[in-house]
Amino acid sequence: MDSQRNLLVIALLFVSFMIWQAWEQDKNPQPQTQQTTQTTTTAAGSAADQGVPASGQGKLITVKTDVLDLTINTRGGDVEQALLPTYPKELGSKEPFQLLETTPQFIYQAQSGLTGRDGPDNPANGPRPLYSVDNDTFVLADGQNELHVPMTWTDAAGNTFTKTFVLKRGEYAVNVNYSVQNAGEKPLEISTFGQLKQSINLPSHRDTGSSNFALHTFRGAAYSTPDEKYEKYKFDTIADNENLNVSSNGGWVAMLQQYFATAWIPRNDGTNNFYTANLGNGIAAIGYKSQPVLVQPGQTGAMTSTLWVGPEIQDKMAAVAPHLDLTVDYGWLWFISQPLFKLLKWIHSFLGNWGFSIIVITFIVRGIMYPLTKAQYTSMAKMRMLQPKIQAMRERLGDDKQRQSQEMMALYKAEKVNPLGGCFPLIIQMPIFLALYYMLMGSIELRHAPFALWIHDLSAQDPYYILPILMGVTMFFIQKMSPTTVTDPMQQKIMTFMPVIFTVFFLWFPSGLVLYYIVSNLVTIIQQQLIYRGLEKRGLHSREKKSS
């Protein structure tokens, strides 16, 4: 095994990953256990069973803070629009990113209210409440840290229901507080609910470019319980009426897309029912309904929940609810990606530039991996030294494959050489590369993050393809500087085109990842020369490149 054959291993692992990525994007449904799912027979059945209403017509009011611009419908008090003024829709644009939307082309809403037997949002009790408000516009003023938006409705029996949105400066978590005044003679049985609903099909104006096979990220629903910290639920699964139905004490439900999320976090002490529903017309929903609370005659009951609507900022999300930060989807290598991001963020606190931070973390990672790299090159050098003996043995034994295998293993044992020693360190390094890929694709901090010169967004592909070409050049130099024992003509052709193949693949990769790979290759060249000098002193390497 030598350096150039290792490139074949890299290529195999890389192509396998890309094939898996594309297959996961289009074909692989999210499996669900029998304990947490049930199949429904009608599209509206699940929503109706939960006592959750449809949208209604009312007056639209505007609520603005320094980080949120919400539009709330007084019919039910649903959040129908959400703009994020500190996050532009596109690089260089003054138009804010829109998370929640209610248009003929696309529906994405955060619904909430009071259901249960006596809840005003229960469809069995008539139309949803039409709340009254004092103003049409609520703005967080300078010097003000908290904004309250009270909405009140009184039913025919004289019971008063107040729904108050509480927003704080610099925060994406919105508390929704309920007050129920029972003016009747019988207890009121009330449950809170929170529901997120969204069009399954993504129109062109909502496409962030993540449909690119190399930039694909998860878009769909998710939930968390004390037993299941983070579970995805695909829109396709909901569309097939394979719906979630699980009880949980604590937890949250969410809808996710690249860099941004919405989530409902119930704040009651009892049990909540988490569910998904196919609402028909191409709309999927995930939500919760709390267990009923009794409000006695003459008494006032208080309930609350929290809506997260904004970017996936891990520290802030973790402070809002346990495991909510896991919505920053780092894939199955999250246990590597998370500490890497914390290290990257720490480096950035000193440098102030994410691109230079990636360069520094590359040196750190490659420095930590240096012992494995040295072991890899040493093993390959020993294997090259054995090639004459192996070739002589093959000529002596002819077509006797069994004898060849036995004597070869005996030779490896006698010379204390592990034939897989060159591959194993390489395989160990591959998860680091993939973890960095997930980290760069999932961290909001790298969205629209500039580096230098023409690189204005490390999370996007290089617009001029300069970095991928430089990456291919560094691969070419590594290949030319590496000794080889490859004699098969087909393998030689593959090795010749390997830098070109990788360059083509990396054309669509985020600039930050390509930057990492370029720096990693440069470090490889430096480490390679240092290791070769040590091997020369031990008689295990020669500067003359052999091809036999």
From Swiss-Prot:
Query: Which CDD domains does the record associate with it?
Result: 5TM_YidC_Alb3, EcYidC-like_peri
The Low complexity compositionally biased stretches are: 29-42
Q: Which Pfam families match?
A: 60KD_IMP, YidC_periplas
Segment Disordered: which positions? 28-54
Please give the start and end residues of each transmembrane region: 6-26, 350-370, 424-444, 458-478, 499-519
| Alphabetic keyword roster | Cell inner membrane, Cell membrane, Chaperone, Membrane, Protein transport, Transmembrane, Transmembrane helix, Transport
Q: Which InterPro entries match?
A: Membr_insert_YidC, Membr_insert_YidC_N, YidC/ALB3/OXA1/COX18, YidC/Oxa/ALB_C, YidC_ALB_C, YidC_periplasmic_sf
Q: What is its main location?
A: membrane
Quote the cellular component terms of the Gene Ontology held in the record.
plasma membrane
- Endpoints of the signal sequence: none
Q: Superkingdom, according to UniProt?
A: Bacteria
Q: Which GO terms describe its molecular function?
A: membrane insertase activity
- Compartment annotation: Cell inner membrane
What's the protein's topology in the membrane?
A: Multi-pass membrane protein
GO BP field: protein insertion into membrane; protein transport
* Keyword set includes Cell membrane: yes
Give the family this protein belongs to, as stated in its UniProt record: Belongs to the OXA1/ALB3/YidC family. Type 1 subfamily.
How does this protein assemble?
Interacts with the Sec translocase complex via SecD. Specifically interacts with transmembrane segments of nascent integral membrane proteins during membrane integration.
Q: Which NCBIfam families match?
A: PRK01318.1-1, PRK01318.1-3, yidC_nterm, yidC_oxa1_cterm
> What the protein does?
Required for the insertion and/or proper folding and/or complex formation of integral membrane proteins into the membrane. Involved in integration of membrane proteins that insert both dependently and independently of the Sec translocase complex, as well as at least some lipoproteins. Aids folding of multispanning membrane proteins.
What protein is this chain from? Membrane protein insertase YidC
The protein's organism comes out as Citrobacter koseri (strain ATCC BAA-895 / CDC 4225-83 / SGSC4696)
Q: By which gene is this protein encoded?
A: yidC
